[in-house]
């Protein structure tokens, strides 16, 4: 097991490579939660995530013979870029195996760091297996994204930076996927301050660490279902499971809806754009029961494409009650659209879109459906709109965020 000086040496090893991301105090989340909240913005790290820390630390510690062989990794995201940049900095050949359908922007970003990219397999597991085959055939050193002590050591340097800036921090919230990030942070933080609490944050649809703890050993989930794709891991690392058992105080799960809302708040209040997995630790702030504590949320990465940003903002607005989308059945006769528009105007609801198709219901003696999207001021405003429609004899059905394009 690592000692404190191991993490200190790792920080020195990384000093010329990484960006020391400064804590950002959040008056917004502090006021909302009753705690003193800080954000550690690893989305501003080189390559856009914390992964460069573990990747560089691992590769830098290889023997000269291992370095001559080159390194190989499998990844569809941040680990690929971390390994590629680390290898480039150290003058080592890097091969990255990515699934065939990895977004082109991620493929090109990895190539720009000088790595050879091979597209293989439909899913990550296929790419992983092919990378292992190439490792055996060509003699490369495989760089695992989380189940590796040197990778864990590199990720733990985040805790040293946090406690250097905020030595009296009470709680650190950490996104939890495979377990590499939380393993390093938990051990390094506890070595510096044994009473600090480390809380992992998993998506509800990929809670592999909680499943392992309940089972008493690592277990593979049958599937994952979450928008936080960076933490959509079916099985945590066996090495990481030991760290979690011994050094992590609690694990919280977050729904996709909670992620959408927190994503919007980060963009709107802090002008911070983060990937969905990175937002987990921010979404978890509301689930902390303690008050008056100094809490640090590790925002683990910011590699997110523009289309996803747009979708997350729209869905976040729906979850926050800033956009209200509903359907209402109208008698199929003239003047109904005018009546609906009049109600919305009286309630100061700004109409974004109306979708009306009188041919949808071929039985002319029945109602037709109107779908309405309006801008609102929150849940109280939505309730007033709903009540007014009800008074006028209309029945409306609220549509959820999954139905927003």
Could you describe each region identified by the protein language model?
Residues 1-405:
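PLP-dependent amino-acid enzyme catalytic core
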């Amino acid at each position: 097991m690592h000692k404190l000086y191991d993490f200190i040496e790792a920080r020195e090893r990384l000093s010329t490579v990484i960006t020391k991301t400064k804590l950002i105090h959040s008056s917004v989340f502090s006021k909302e939660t009753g705690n003193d909240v800080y954000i550690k913005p690893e989305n501003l790290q080189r390559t856009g995530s914390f992964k460069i820390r573990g990747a560089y630390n691992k590769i830098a510690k290889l023997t000269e013979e291992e370095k001559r062989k080159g390194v190989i990794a499998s990844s569809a995201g941040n680990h690929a870029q971390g390994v590629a940049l680390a290898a480039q900095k150290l003058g080592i050949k890097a091969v990255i195996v990515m699934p065939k359908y990895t977004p082109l922007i991620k493929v090109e970003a990895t190539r720009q760091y000088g790595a050879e990219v091979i597209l293989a397999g439909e899913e990550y597991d296929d790419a992983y297996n092919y990378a292992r085959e190439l490792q055996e055939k060509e003699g490369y050193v495989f760089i695992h994204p989380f189940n590796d002590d040197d990778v864990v050591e590199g990720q733990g340097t985040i805790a040293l930076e946090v406690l250097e800036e905020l030595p009296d921090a009470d709680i650190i919230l950490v996104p939890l996927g495979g377990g590499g990030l939380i393993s390093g942070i938990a051990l390094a933080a506890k070595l510096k301050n044994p009473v600090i609490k480390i809380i992992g944050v998993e998506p509800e649809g990929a809670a592999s660490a909680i499943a392992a703890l309940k089972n008493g050993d690592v277990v593979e989930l049958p599937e994952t279902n979450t928008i936080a794709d960076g933490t959509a891991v079916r099985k945590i690392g066996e090495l990481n499971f030991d760290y979690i058992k011994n050094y992590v105080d609690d694990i919280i799960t977050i729904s996709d809806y909670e992620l959408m809302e927190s994503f919007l708040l980060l963009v709107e209040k802090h002008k911070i754009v983060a990937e969905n997995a990175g937002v987990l630790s921010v979404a978890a702030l509301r689930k902390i029961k303690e008050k008056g504590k100094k809490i640090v949320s590790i925002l683990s990465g910011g590699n997110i494409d523009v289309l996803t940003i747009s979708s997350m903002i729209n869905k976040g607005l729906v979850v926050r009650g800033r956009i209200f989308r509903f359907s209402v059945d109208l008698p199929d006769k003239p003047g109904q659209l005018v009546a609906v528009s009049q109600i919305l105007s009286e309630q100061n609801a700004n109409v974004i879109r109306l979708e009306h198709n009188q041919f949808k219901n071929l039985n002319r003696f029945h109602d037709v459906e109107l779908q309405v999207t309006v801008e609102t001021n929150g849940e109280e405003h939505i309730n007033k709109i709903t009540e007014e429609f009800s008074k006028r004899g209309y029945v409306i059905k609220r549509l959820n965020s999954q139905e927003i394009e």
